[in-house]
Amino acid sequence: MTQQTGQDADQRPSYKDTLNLLETGFGMRANAIHREPELQAFWKEKGIDLDLGRNNPGPVFTLHDGPPYANGALHMGHALNKVLKDIINKHRLMQGRKVRFVPGWDCHGLPIELKVLQAMNQEQRQALTPIKLRKKAAAYAHKQVAGQRAGFQRWGIWADWDHPYLTLQKDYEAAQIDVFGTMALKGHIYRGLKPVHWSPSSRTALAEAELEYPDGHTSPSVYVGFPVVDLPESLRSKLNAQGLDVPAASDTLSQCLQVAIWTTTPWTLPANLAVSVNDRLDYCLADDGNGQLLIVAAELCDSIASKLERPLQAKATVKGADLAGITYSHPLLERRSAIVVGGEYITTESGTGLVHTAPGHGVDDFNTGRKHGLPVLCPVDEAGTLTAEAGPFEGLNVLKDANAKIIAALEDSGSLLLQESYSHRYPYDWRTKKPTIFRATEQWFASVEGFRTEALTAIDGVQWLPASGRNRIESMVSERGDWCISRQRTWGVPIPVFYQRETGEVLLNSDSIAHVKALIAEHGADIWWEKDEVDLLPSSHKAEAHLWRKGTDTMDVWFDSGSSWASVSSQRDGLSYPADLYLEGSDQHRGWFQSSLLTSVAVNGTAPYRTVLTHGFALDEKGRKMSKSLGNVVDPMVIIEGGKNQKQEPAYGADVLRLWVSSVDYSADVPIGAGILRQLSDVYRKVRNTSRYLLGNLHDFIPSRDAISISDLPLLDRWMLQRTATVLDQISEAFERYEFFRFFQLLQNFCVADLSNFYLDIAKDRLYVSAPNDKRRRSCQTVMALIIERLAAAIAPVLCHMAEDIWQNIPYPTGTESVFLSGWPSVPEEWRDDSLRDPMQELRELRAAVNKVLEECRSKRKLGSSLEAAVRLEARTPALQDALQWLQSKGDQEVDGLRDWLLVSQLQIGGEPWAELLASDDNELAVIEVALSRGQKCERCWHYEADIGQYSDHPGLCGRCVSVLERR
């Protein structure tokens, strides 16, 4: 085969003006910094989000917002959470559901109180009254809410921003008082002296959800011998039976027999009132070779001997129950106590098998002490300082100098067996980042035991995504103790109780609760601090107001946020209770999910949600937590607007941030960083450029005038619609399952593999070269119009700004002014032609195989454009043979279409092998031969045709192009 040269380049006329070139106002660059706010202003001006949420015909969908804390700048965790919620809400809106998303903020608590205090000098702090502090805290919270709200709005989040819920709002506080009151009247609230997690740095009790367990905590652990001064006769008899005689006199006995205990909190030893054993464990009296006997768990005897570096030989073995009643003397104080039977918490996993018991400083200790009638001794004040009850250790701080002084005293007394450092999980105050302690105080508790079974039943009725969430919260609720809900702070919702000044009797009844609730509903919680008892007490007690004092405790902030269902989803218009969905980080199984569940079940016997969906945490690209010290913090606003160095931190816009959220499997922790953002930006550009190409080819297309009926479309166009239908089905399923990473993958593959690299690549010729009204061009435009409308709608929940920009640049009337008014994309049944799927897949694979051979020719510089090539095919597989026969049965036009699909100038199927080949490939699919195409290059369409030069008016054009020019 030969290929001839056409006219010299400088003699060729230009046919550029005869081609159908792209025309669109949809730019290649998003210019997101300017364009996104314009689109957001358009939505607000038209009221599209709120009107759609109110006027949609479908049922209500309520995604109840877990309130972020009103303090600090927004971070990637906020972005992950709020964008996920927005994607879901926008999808439900487009499905026709009524959606009113009410954003919330958690506004009470210590961090805000500390911020207020930090902004004041010592003199100002001393002059600060509780009500002044509350006013300043409220002002600070409102300012923080305003800043965070502006950030959320810039991300394209749709919400009822003018009517958010804040836990400091009076209607919210009143609803919370109602929740507390109902629980109290049902018997679920009580006051008691009990060990609680206490933060000396905050000087308040903490709930489990307010604790964190940082890595690397080390405690000074000690093994201590308590001298035994008396044995029960029953134990003495059992020891004698084993050949072990012990002295009867207590002073002699104490010199030779010790109870060995182990503790990681030496500062609690002044509060020791017992040693506890497990009645079912074996214990031995072991001789250390120096005439000293130690009582330890038999199973631990060898390991303790190794630790103490002294031989221990068991002389007698008894059950734990036999040890009960042994009397020992405190090694540091003038106090005698007894060994008692504890519980299953006493094991042989660590320590000695005998547990130092201080009922004022541990839950197990407290429960054991209560069982045996021990007093609750707590010689530690609110600052963590030992009191006079600690004897010579008074004034020492338990987290500073107390441990060292007590260890030194143990050594001086000869009771210290061993001291060593011990690394373990230890609770810290999540706000101050300082260690906490267990400390018995008078607190208010929610008794979970009263409704635990109901709560577990409610958990079973909820859909947990991922499913592991159910086991997680189920085990937490099953095992959790009573909930300490009181805090010794000023900035919060008051616990509405009164105490009889002389007796301490508590007033908490339906009248007092109703009266306080009504006052707070009208005036807000500040009234508790502004008014005296005479105004706060119900009418039945006003005459004796002088006998009562109001409480000073406030409620745990988890009780605040955990009551949101009562104030928001069950009371506000356009919402539903239980809510359809709660969506927060996986840490909220122990936080908001649980506090909301407990309050809702306690009050109404039902969970406040139907489905709970959790996400992981945002990490850097190396999988590390973000921190200023590591310098790896990614700021969502820098992603959107760019950093100081725009080359290193370019402005990507909100849609790239949103695309990141859709791209990750958020059920686990998710990475984000500069490299990931660059990759996402590339994907964003591909989607945008694909959309631009579709729009640019529709500038002269009006569907009502130019559209071709589906049944009259060529095979490739019908296949493209069939493929679009399949992809849209898969995208819809991904949204329904909240698997947005599948949407991301489907979108990327559809825009790149199906459209850009296949359909649109093939369509260029008929789009550019055909006469404007040619059926082959109008057919392609028909498909492009149908696709761009549905593509815009399908990406709208995620790429909301791009979708709206596409919609506003569709050059023909769409019937709706916003993509969000167009509804979730659906496809007519006539698009679904399964007969096209298999043969077209074979032909796509054939195209890939041909492209591979053509690319080899290009790489060896045997070819420039693929249009310089002619290709002969010979099918090898039955499937491809069937596909080619199927194609031939559709007529010559479709066979010629295959040539266009391959982007070559000539195509031969079957026949004799060619000579003068550029390349060939005999693979499993087909024999592929490539030669130079015959004829000359058309100056307009660039195809090589044999009829070039036969048309005097256009000697450089092929017959097809001459015909087009005659019709233009």
From Swiss-Prot:
Its EC number is 6.1.1.5. One of its GO terms (molecular function) is isoleucine-tRNA ligase activity. Its main location: cytoplasm. InterPro entries: aa-tRNA-synth_I_CS (IPR001412), aa-tRNA-synth_Ia (IPR002300), Anticodon_Ile_BEm (IPR033708), Ile-tRNA-ligase (IPR002301), Ile-tRNA-ligase_type1 (IPR023585), Ile-tRNA_ligase (IPR050081), M/V/L/I-tRNA-synth_anticd-bd (IPR013155), Rossmann-like_a/b/a_fold (IPR014729). Disulfide bonds: none annotated. Zn(2+) binds at C938, C941, C958, C961. It catalyses: tRNA(Ile) + L-isoleucine + ATP = L-isoleucyl-tRNA(Ile) + AMP + diphosphate. It holds the Pfam family Anticodon_1. GO terms for cellular component: cytoplasm. L-isoleucyl-5'-AMP binds at E584. HAMAP family: Ile_tRNA_synth_type1. This is Isoleucine--tRNA ligase. The gene is ileS.
